Amino acid sequence: MSENRKPLLGFVSKLTSGTALGNSGKTHCPLCLGLFKAPRLLPCLHTVCTTCLEQLEPFSVVDIRGGDSDTSSEGSIFQELKPRSLQSQIGILCPVCDAQVDLPMGGVKALTIDHLAVNDVMLESLRGEGQGLVCDLCNDREVEKRCQTCKANLCHFCCQAHRRQKKTTYHTMVDLKDLKGYSRIGKPILCPVHPAEELRLFCEFCDRPVCQDCVVGEHREHPCDFTSNVIHKHGDSVWELLKGTQPHVEALEEALAQIHIINSALQKRVEAVAADVRTFSEGYIKAIEEHRDKLLKQLEDIRAQKENSLQLQKAQLEQLLADMRTGVEFTEHLLTSGSDLEILITKRVVVERLRKLNKVQYSTRPGVNDKIRFCPQEKAGQCRGYEIYGTINTKEVDPAKCVLQGEDLHRAREKQTASFTLLCKDAAGEIMGRGGDNVQVAVVPKDKKDSPVRTMVQDNKDGTYYISYTPKEPGVYTVWVCIKEQHVQGSPFTVMVRRKHRPHSGVFHCCTFCSSGGQKTARCACGGTMPGGYLGCGHGHKGHPGHPHWSCCGKFNEKSECTWTGGQSAPRSLLRTVAL
C-alpha cells in the first residue's frame, strides 16, 4: 500500500502546490469570501458554502437529462442512489464558471461535501490559535484539544468527559497549538444512515463508501472491502484519468500563451499599421490641400485671363461703337441740315471716314466663354509622391468639330470585329486631350432597325475613343455617333458589311518545289511548271510569278481573301501542294 500510495500522494501534493485543481487548498468561499461553512463540491469541481448555494436563484431545466448526466448523478456519497429516471428539473449556475448544475432530488444539501476544504478550513483556523473552531460533541464551546484516536475536536468540558469514559480513557489527546505542523486533521467521515459508524469500507457494486452496519445490512450480498485495500485500484483509475487530463491542461496553457503572444503582436502590429495610416493620411491630406490650392490659383488665373480678354474686347468694341456713332450722327446731321455746297465740301472727308469704319473687322461674339469645368475623376499627376485626381478644364467638346477615323469606318465583315476611332475637338478645332465625355454609339441594320448591334466604347483618356462592334449578318448598316445628343462630324453614315473573310486553303510559299519538298505531282494555282516532269512552279522557271504567293489562288498578299471558287476552271487537284 505504501509503495503504491506514495507516488499518488506525491503527485497530488505537487499539483496542489503549483496547480489549482478545482478548489483544493482553498479555504474561502468565492461568494461570501469567508471561510467555508459546510462546503459543497459542484460537478464543475468548484466549492461553495451550502448557505451561499441555497441563496442562488434556481431555474427550471427545459430538457430532463438522462441517467448519464454527470451533473445530476454526483450527489453526496451519503445519499441513497436514486433511479436514473427521476432526475431533477431544478438547476443553478455555478457562481465561478456559470456552468449549469442540475440539483439532485435532495437539493443543495444532497451535493457532495468537500472534505478537503473542511480540512483546509480547520488548518487555517489552527493557524489563528483555533479561533472559530467549536467542539464536535457539544457544538457550543471553543476547542482546546483534539482526540487523535477519534479525530474529534473537543472543548475542555468534553475533553474531561472523554477521559472518564472507559472506551476513550486511553485515547491520545493533543493540544491545538501542537497541531499547527500537521497537514491533515479532518474529522472522521460518518455514515449518513448509521451516524455512529465511520465509513471505512467500499462497496464495489454500488461504487460508494459504506460502514460496517451497511455491510451486514443493505450491502450484505455486495462485494465490499476496506478502503485501504481498494484505494490502489480506484486511485490508479483516477490517476490514469488525471494523466489523460494533464496534457489538455498543458495544451490549453500553451494555447493561451500563444494567444497572449499573438494578441501582443496584434496590438503592436495594429499600432504600427495605425501609425502608417496616420502618416499616409496626413501626407495625403497635405498633398490634397496643396493640390487644392493649385487648382484654386489656376482657377483664379483663368478668371483673370478671361476677364482681361473680355475687358479688352469690351474697350475695343466701345471705342468702335463711339467711332461709329460719331460717323453716323455727323453724316446724318450733314445730310439733313447742310446745304448742297456744305455737303459737297465735306463729302470727301465723310466718305473716307465711313469707308474706313465699314472696313473695320470685329466679332459680335464674346472672345471667351464661361466654360470652366472641374473633373474630379481625371488624373492630375503626382503631388508629394501621391497620385492626385481632379483637374480644371476650360475646353468644351464641340460635336461638329469631332471627327471619325479608321480603316473599318465604312466597311466590315460579318462575325468579325470592326473598329474606328472618334477624335474629339473643341470649338477652336483643338484636340481635347482628355476623356470623360458621354459618347453614344448605335449600329443598326438598315432592314432590321429593331435589332441594333452591341457596341463597345473605350475611353482612351486622351480625347480619343475606341469604338468597336461585331455585325452578325452581311448587309447595309447605319452608324450613329453622338456627343451631348448631337451628331459628330460625318454622323450618321453607312457601313457595308460583307460576308465572312474566306480563308486560304493552300500555303503561302515561294514555289511549289520548296514547299512540297521536291514532289513532282504537287501543283500551284500560279500555273508555273518545271522541266523534268514537275507539275508545280519553281524559282526562275516558266510561269513563276516572281513573288511569294498562295498555292490555292495565286494571290501575292498573305493577308488577302482566297478567291478560289472550287469550280471546273480550277480543279482541286490542280491546287494541291504539300507543306512540310
UniProtKB/Swiss-Prot annotation:
Q: Where are the Filamin repeats?
A: 394-497
> Highest lineage ranks of the organism?
Eukaryota, Metazoa, Chordata, Craniata, Vertebrata
- Enzymatic reactions: S-ubiquitinyl-[E2 ubiquitin-conjugating enzyme]-L-cysteine + [acceptor protein]-L-lysine = [E2 ubiquitin-conjugating enzyme]-L-cysteine + N(6)-ubiquitinyl-[acceptor protein]-L-lysine
Q: SUPFAM superfamilies per the record?
A: B-box zinc-binding domain, E set domains, RING/U-box
Q: Which GO terms describe its biological process?
A: bone development; negative regulation of inflammatory response; proteasome-mediated ubiquitin-dependent protein catabolic process; protein K48-linked ubiquitination
UniProt feature coiled coil, ranges: 281-335
The cross-references to Pfam families, in alphabetical order and at most eight, read: Filamin, zf-B_box, zf-RING_UBOX
Keyword annotations:
Coiled coil, Cytoplasm, Metal-binding, Nucleus, Repeat, Transferase, Ubl conjugation pathway, Zinc, Zinc-finger
Task: Please give the CDD domains that the UniProt record associates with this protein.
Answer: Bbox1_TRIM45_C-X (cd19809), Bbox2_TRIM45_C-X (cd19785), RING-HC_TRIM45_C-VII (cd16588)
Q: What protein does this entry describe? A: E3 ubiquitin-protein ligase TRIM45
State one molecular function term (GO). Answer: zinc ion binding
CC terms in the record's Gene Ontology section: cytoplasm; cytosol; intercellular bridge; nucleoplasm
Q: Where does Zn(2+) 1 bind?
A: 135, 138, 158, 162
In the record, the note on similarity to other proteins reads: Belongs to the TRIM/RBCC family.
Binding-site positions, Zn(2+) 2: 191, 194, 214, 219
Tissues and organs where the protein is expressed, per its UniProt entry: Expressed in skeletal muscle, brain, heart and pancreas.
Residue spans annotated as Zn fingers (RING-type) read 29-98
Q: Where in the cell is it found?
A: Cytoplasm; Nucleus
Gene3D superfamilies recorded for this chain? Classic Zinc Finger, Immunoglobulins, Zinc/RING finger domain, C3HC4 (zinc finger)
Q: Which function does this protein serve?
A: E3 ubiquitin-protein ligase that plays a role in the regulation of inflammatory response. Mechanistically, mediates the 'Lys-48'-linked polyubiquitination of TAB2, a regulatory protein of the kinase TAK1, leading to its degradation via the proteasomal pathway and inhibition of the TLR-mediated inflammatory immune response. May act as a transcriptional repressor in mitogen-activated protein kinase signaling pathway.
User: What EC identifiers does the entry list?
Assistant: 2.3.2.27
Zinc finger regions, B box-type: 130-176, 186-227
Question: The organism sits in which domain of life?
Answer: Eukaryota
| Source organism | Homo sapiens (Human)
